[in-house]
Amino acid sequence: MTQSPRACSAPPARPLLIVAGPTASGKSALALAAAQRFGGTIINADAMQCYADWRIITARPTPADEAAAPHRLYGVRRLEEAVDAAWWRGRALAELAAAELPILCGGTGMYLSSLVNGIAPIPDPGPNARAEARRMLAADGPAALHAWLAARDPATATKLRPSDPQRLARAAEVLLGTGRGLAAWHAAPRAGLAGYRVMLLLLDPPRPALREAIAARFEAMLAAGALAEVAAVAARAPDPALPGLRAHGVPELLAHLAGAISLDEAASRAIAATAAYTKRQATWFRHQKLADQRNTHTIRSRLTDSTQFSESTVRSIISFINLSS
């Protein structure tokens, strides 16, 4: 018996909210407000907040926040464990499938793009290639590794700065382990996100307000015990090349703990570095497509609580969710 077109039709696409924006723009407050109002599950899309070692220094949601709404993928990896876009995407897809209303929250643009637009199908280079790339970096330095890469994979080398050791090591390990450069892998076809309709709530506050928030937040982190948190990790003598050691404020506090700079200087440098990073984040988000224009809502102020959740945005979200049901 032939099924009717209605019986054969695919199920309606499910709603997915993305709360994105630069560091300290108020993403966590907005995501929590949305989760409480609409019954959502918050899924972390911030690379550094994946690490269990970094609760204070990354401003992870507090235990009270986590009790107020379901939170997923926060503090799920040790610093010594690998966290990258491919690993995160696999975990995030599983969390999306389990959530009634998934709410992605984070500022790691590469993670969000990998989920929505797909990710290059790069195989695992393997431990030997990874170790050799690290050895080359430690022995010769980033400039020499960049020159080595330029001679063998110029398409990738032209996109990397000689002063960026982490990305250079990643490019080297991929070339060594797969025989193919990162640029070639990134040019390969990729599958995007199927079965979901995406709404983007993009926070883009004025830079002076953001800079003020960054400074206040770092001082609050120090008062809450960020220095002790970093000292506990430093006591383990971790590999200096670990990506998790690049979390905002960590390099500066490590330098202070080593006696190289004062705590005031560490705070000043951390605030400046974070502010510079937020400028790059804001630029990236303005030029990347994570949702259709009609489902993209840009919020020009820094959110601190749900009282700034405008009724027009609420109505848009309700309409968006209902269309998916």
Curated annotation (Swiss-Prot):
Keyword RNA-binding, does the record have it? no
Q: Which GO terms describe its biological process?
A: tRNA modification
Q: Name one Pfam family in it.
A: IPPT
Amino acids binding substrate: T23, A24, S25, G26, K27, S28
Show which residues form the site (Interaction with substrate tRNA).
T108, R130
Listed as disulfide-bonded, the cysteine pairs are none
What InterPro entries does this protein map onto? Dimethylallyltransferase, IPT, P-loop_NTPase
EC number, as in UniProt: 2.5.1.75
Which cofactor(s) are needed, names only?
Mg(2+)
Residue ranges, annotated region (Interaction with substrate tRNA):
166-170
Report the protein's function: Catalyzes the transfer of a dimethylallyl group onto the adenine at position 37 in tRNAs that read codons beginning with uridine, leading to the formation of N6-(dimethylallyl)adenosine (i(6)A).
Can you say what this protein is called? tRNA dimethylallyltransferase
